[in-house]
Amino acid sequence: MPRVKGGTVTRARRKKTIKLAKGYFGSKHTLYKVAKQQVMKSGQYAFRDRRQRKRDFRKLWITRINAAARQHDISYSRLMNGLKKAEIDINRKMLSEIAISDDKAFAELVSKAKEALK
């Protein structure tokens, strides 16, 4: 039985890694060994940051809501507590969008939250 060296498989695997490393700086997009390490590290960063992104957006929404709420003389925590007591079920993403785009509607929500707190 003849010996099989597997050259095509090896070349294909290496080409795939180099292709994934496209756009990397220096030898990281040309040398296989370094490219392989960087592609693995990039995957780790991507995995971590997909989770981080969710936290970052939530933080951003809360900051926006707090800024808009303070213009109406109420803190973020009191606003959220008031909305909960008024049984207004609206998520932070939508609330921040309303705060940015529709000040009238946000003012209405704030007034209902203030009423519920009394």
UniProtKB/Swiss-Prot annotation:
It comes from Staphylococcus epidermidis (strain ATCC 35984 / DSM 28319 / BCRC 17069 / CCUG 31568 / BM 3577 / RP62A). This is Large ribosomal subunit protein bL20. GO terms for molecular function: rRNA binding; structural constituent of ribosome. Belongs to the bacterial ribosomal protein bL20 family. The lineage of its organism: Bacteria, Bacillati, Bacillota, Bacilli, Bacillales. Binds directly to 23S ribosomal RNA and is necessary for the in vitro assembly process of the 50S ribosomal subunit. It is not involved in the protein synthesizing functions of that subunit. InterPro entries: Ribosomal_bL20, RIBOSOMAL_L20_CS, Ribosomal_protein_bL20_C. GO terms for biological process: ribosomal large subunit assembly; translation. It holds the Pfam family Ribosomal_L20. GO terms for cellular component: ribonucleoprotein complex; ribosome. Keywords: Ribonucleoprotein, Ribosomal protein, RNA-binding, rRNA-binding.
